[in-house]
Amino acid sequence: MNLEEFVHLHVHSDYSIVDGLSKPEDLIKKSVNLGMKALSITDFNNLYGAIKFYNAAHKWGLKPIIGVTVKFFSELIKNELTELTLLATNQDGYKNLILLISRAYKKGYFCEKYVTIEKKWLSELNNGLILLSGGCQGEIGKTLLRGQTSLISDCLHFYEKYFSGFYYLELIRTYRENEEKYLSLAVDLSYSQNIPVVATNDVCFLNKEDFKIHKIRIAINEGVRLKESKIQNNYSKHQFLKTEKEMCFLFSDIPEAIINSVEISKRCNVFIKSGQYFLPQFNTRKISIENYLIQKSNKGLKKRLESNFKKVDKEIFLKYKNRLDTELGIINKMGFPSYFLIVMEFIQWAKDNNIPVGPGRGSGAGSLVAYVLNITEVDPLFFDLLFERFLNPERISLPDFDIDFCMEKRDRVIEHVVHTYGRESVAQIITFGTMTAKAVIRDVGRVLGYPYGFINNLSKLVPLDPGITLKDAFSKNSELYTLYKSDEDIQNLIDVSKKLEGVNRNVGKHAGGVVISPSKITDFCPVYCDEKGNNPVTQFDKNDIEYVGLLKFDFLGLRTLTIINCAVNMINKNLLLSNKKTININSIPLNESKCFLLLKKCETTGIFQLESYGMKDLVKRLQPDCFEDIIALIALFRPGPLQSGMVDNFINRKHGYEEISYPDHKWQHILLKPVLESTYGIILYQEQVMQIAQILAGYTLGKADILRRAMSKKNIKDMAEQRSIFIEGAQKNGINRKLAIKIFDLLEKFAGYGFNKSHSVAYALVSYQTLWLKAHYPSEFMASAMTSDIDNTDKIVMLVNESIQMGIKIIPPNINLSKYEFYVDHTKNIVYGLGAVKGIGRNPILNLVQEREKNGLFSDLFDLCMRTDPNKITRKVLEKLIMSGSCDCFNKNRNYLLSLIEDAIKASKEHFKIKKFQQESLFGSFKEELNILKKNNNLLNSFSDEEKKLENEHKVLGLYLTGHPIDRYAEELKYYLNNSTFSKLKLFNHTKKKIMVAGIVVSIKTKVTKNKNRIVILILDDSTGLLEVVIFKRLLNISEKLIQLNKILIVSGFLNTNFISKNLKMTAYDIMNLNLAREKYLDKLTIVLTEKQRDKCFLKKIYQFFQNQTTGIVPVYIFCKKKDLDSEYKLIKKWLITISNKLLVELDIFSKENKMQIKYF
C-alpha cells in the first residue's frame, strides 16, 4: 500500500446550501489536478448535487463516491442532535440513501435548519451503506467526550448489529475544540473494540484562503454582520481540500486511518443508469398503447376536419392524414405514445372541469397529433409549422409540452394528476437560487459592515440585464470598473462578491415542472418537502431528472387565460339572460377588421404580449392588418431583431418602401417565395431556416433541425460540417454554388435571431382573443383584466385610466353595490371591486358581501357594523372603506363617518354581546342609546375637507375616482396653461418646443447620475393622465422646497420620449407652485354682482371680508351686471391682495353664502 494515497470521504459542496462553498465540478477539477483517483460528495441532508457530481467525475476521469451527512437525535445521550456520514457502496446503498433522505423530509423532522432522520431507520435501510461515525459531532464522539463509558457498548451494539464491517470511527484533525481529545479516545476505542478508523477533513471549501469567504457566506445566511456570527466558530481554516500528501502527513501517527480511506473508496461502486426513459402506463385496456394512440388520433382528426372545413375533399384529407401518419410513426418508434396520452388526459379533464387551457406554447404547437388530441388549438398545417422542431427522429430528443392553465385553477389540475397516478408518484421539480451580481454585493457589503448608502449606490452600478455577472458588469459599465481600480473598499467588496457569485443560496420550485413516475418517485430520485412534510419536490433539477429517466410535464399558470375565462363567463351570462347565442372564444374569426382597427390605433393596454410601450411603438410602425402580422410582432419584439435592423427591413418591406426579395435582393431564389412570403422575404422563424435547408439542399426536416440547432449554438466545428453538407446538397439540386454559399451565410446570420414560430402562433392566438374581447365587449374585458390584477394597484390605475379613455364609466366602490371583484352592470358600466381597496383583504370583503346578499343593503355605518362580526370588520377595514368612498352611499360626509367609527364599533360589540347571551331585555335600552348616537350633527364639508378626502382616496385606491384635487383649480389653470392637459400632449410637435403643464405630484424618486449629481423624477397627475418630469441639478437647487407629494406644481419644459418605455416625459426648465404662478400671471380678482346686490349693505360685507386679507399685488375689481350696460369698478388701492389657498377657501364659503360669482382674472 502506498502511504501517500488518500481519498476524501467527507466533502460538502455548495449544495449543502450553507455548509459548503464549492461547486461539485470545481472540487473534482482540483482533485484531478492534485492527482487524486476518487472523491466523495456528502452534502448535508440532501442529494441535490449527486448527479452533477457523478457526471462531472466521469467527465474528468475521477471515481465518484456518493454519500450524505445526516443528523439524528440520540436516545442514549438525552436526545441530543448527532451526526453520521453515509456512503453508498452499490446500487442498494444508493437507493437506501434516497429513501432515508426522502423519508426525513416526508416525516417533517426538522430541527432548526436541519432535517433529521430516525436512528432506527438505519436498521431497515442498512444494505449497501458504509457509516462514518461523525467525529466529535457523532453519537460515539459525544459519548466519549462526556466520559460516559457505560453507554459506549450500547451505542456500538447497534452499529455492530446492523453495520458489521461497514462502520468506521471517523477521525478529523482540523484543530477545532475537543478534536484531539476525541481523536485519542477514539483510537483507544478502536484498538480495544477492534473497530476500524478512517481519516477525513470535513471539507467545506476548496482552498485555505477561502475560509474568510466561507465565514462571510455563513454570516449572510444568518443575517448578521461577520463579527456577530456565532455559527462560524464551528469551522476551521483547515477544512479545505488538502492534498493526499498533506493528509498523509497529518495522520502519519495513525497510518491505518489513511489506508482505510482508500479501502473504503474501493468498496464504493455506484453506477447510475441513464439513457432510458420511464413513463407511467396509460390504461388502454386490451389495446396496445401504440394502437390506442393511433385510434384516438384518427378520431380526433375526423372531428377537427369536419369542424374546420365546410367540405373535406380527398386532397385535404390526404394532406392531413399523411402528416398524421408520419407523426404517429415517429412518436411510436421513439417510445412516447404514453407521454401524448397522459397530456391528452389531464388537458381534457381540465376542459371538462371548466379550467381554461391555453392553445399551446413552444414547439409543441407544431404537432398535428397534439392538435387532433385537443392538446393544442393550433392547426400546424394551416400555419406551416413543423413537427420535427418539437420531436426530432434524427437525434435524441424528448417531447416537452409547455401547457398554460388558468392561474387560479392550475393547482387543481396538478391535484388531479396526483389523484390519478398516486401521491407517491408525482412531484414538482426543484430549482436552486444562486447569489446574483447585484444581490451578492448587497449581502457581502452588509455582512462586512459597509454603510447602506455605499452598498446601495455600488449595487446600482450593476446593469439590470438578466443573468449578468460581475465580470460582465465591468465591461458594460466603465464607471464600476474605474471605481474598482481606484477605491480599496470597493475592490475588497467586489473581490469577495466574485467568489460568492453563483453559489447556491436556497432552494425553490420550478414554475410549472412536474414529474410523473411509473412507480414511486423515490425509485428514481430523492424528494424534498416543506416542514410539514407536504408538497414533494424532486431533489434533482430538471436536467438531472431527465438524466435518471423521468420526463417533465410543464403545468404553467397564465394570468391572461384567467382574464379571458372571466370575461367570457360574464359575457355569456348576460347573453343567456337576453336569450342570445353565447360566444366560443376558440371559434372566433381571425380576420375581423374591428380588431385590427383597434390594434392599429395602438389601443393595446390589457392585450396579451402587445401592451408594453415598446410593443405599442412597434405596432404603430408596422400597422398590422392580418393575423400573420400579429404572429410576426411577437417574433420581432426581441433584442436580436430590434438591434439587427431586421425590424426596420420587415416594416419597410410591408409598406412598400423596400423591395421584397427571397431573402436578399442580391442573393435570392424563387423556390423560397412560398416559405418567406408571409414575412415579406425576411427569415424570421426557425421553421423557415429548416424549410430553406429542405428545399434548397435536400435536408430531411430532422437534419434541418440539427442544422438550426448548430446555427443557434454557433459551434465552429459543427457549422463547418453543416456548411459543406448544405452547399453539396444545394448543388445536387441544381443551385449555383456561389448562391448556395451566400444563402447559407444569410441563414447563419438570421438563425441567431430566428424565433420559434409554433410558440409565436400560439401566443398570437391568445393575443388576438384578448384583442377581440376588447373590441367587441370592452367593459367585460377591462373588468376581468382589473380583477385578475386586483392586488396590483399600479396595474389597476392603468386599466381604469384606459377604460375611462375608452368611454367606459367606472362606478366608484360602493358597500351596497360592489363585490370583491370588478364586474359590469346592466348599463355596461364597470363597478369597482372592493378587493382593489388597499389594506382590507379578501375575507372581510367576502363577509360584507355575503351579509348584504343575505339580508339586504346596509342603511348606515351602524347597521353595517351591527350586522358583521367586529373581529372581521375591524377599525382598519372601516377606515379604508370610508376613505375609498365605499360608504358614500350613506350620504354622509367622510370625515363624519370616520368620526363615528369608535361609536359604531362600540355599538356593534354591545349588540353582539347582547345577542350572544340572549339578553332580550337589554335590547330596548340599547336601541335608545343607538338612536342618540345617530343624532349627531353632520360636519360641514369644507374645501380643506375635500382636499383631505381626495388625498385619502388616492392613498387607498392609488387613483382619484370621485373627483380630482386639480379640478378645483381647473379654470384658474387654463389661464396659465392654455389648456395643455396630459392627454393632449401626444398631439404636440414637441421637438424644441417649450410648453407648460400642471399636475399634482403623486410620486417622487431621487437618482444619482454617473457624475454624482442628484436628479429628481416626478410623476404628475392632471386627471387626464400621468406625466414623468425629470428635474436636473440647476433647477433642483433653487426649487427643491416646492417639490412635495400631493401638491400641485406648474412646470414648464421640453417634451421628449422615454427611450425604454417610448412614453412621453418632460425635462423641467422651471417650476412653480400655485402661489408663485398667481404672483406671476394673475392680473386681478373680480367679484361679479347682480344689480340687486349693489346696495350699501352688501358692499359693506365685501369691504369687511377684504379688510382681513393679507396685502399683496393683485387688485380686486367689482363687476356689476345691468340690463342695459355692464360695468367694472376697481376697488381702492389698499385692497391689493395675495391669492392663497386659504383666501380661496374663505372666498368659496363667502360667495356661496352670498350667491355671487368670483373670477380670478
Swiss-Prot record:
Pfam families: DNA_pol3_alpha (PF07733), DNA_pol3_finger (PF17657), HHH_6 (PF14579), PHP (PF02811), tRNA_anti-codon (PF01336)
Cystine pairs: none
Keywords from the named record: Cytoplasm, DNA replication, DNA-directed DNA polymerase, Nucleotidyltransferase, Transferase
GO MF terms, alphabetically ordered: 3'-5' exonuclease activity; DNA-directed DNA polymerase activity; nucleic acid binding
Catalytic activity line of the entry: DNA(n) + a 2'-deoxyribonucleoside 5'-triphosphate = DNA(n+1) + diphosphate
Keyword Transferase tagged: yes
One GO location term (cellular component): cytoplasm
InterPro entries associated with the record: DNA_pol3_alpha_NTPase_dom, DNA_pol3_alpha_thumb_dom, DNA_pol3_finger, DnaE2/DnaE/PolC, DNAPol_HHH, NA-bd_OB-fold, NA-bd_OB_tRNA, PHP_dom
SUPFAM superfamilies linked to this entry: PHP domain-like
Coiled-coil regions, chain positions: none
Subunit structure: DNA polymerase III contains a core (composed of alpha, epsilon and theta chains) that associates with a tau subunit. This core dimerizes to form the PolIII' complex. PolIII' associates with the gamma complex (composed of gamma, delta, delta', psi and chi chains) and with the beta chain to form the complete DNA polymerase III complex.
Functional note: DNA polymerase III is a complex, multichain enzyme responsible for most of the replicative synthesis in bacteria. This DNA polymerase also exhibits 3' to 5' exonuclease activity. The alpha chain is the DNA polymerase.
Family: Belongs to the DNA polymerase type-C family. DnaE subfamily.
Protein name from the UniProt record: DNA polymerase III subunit alpha
Gene this protein is translated from: dnaE
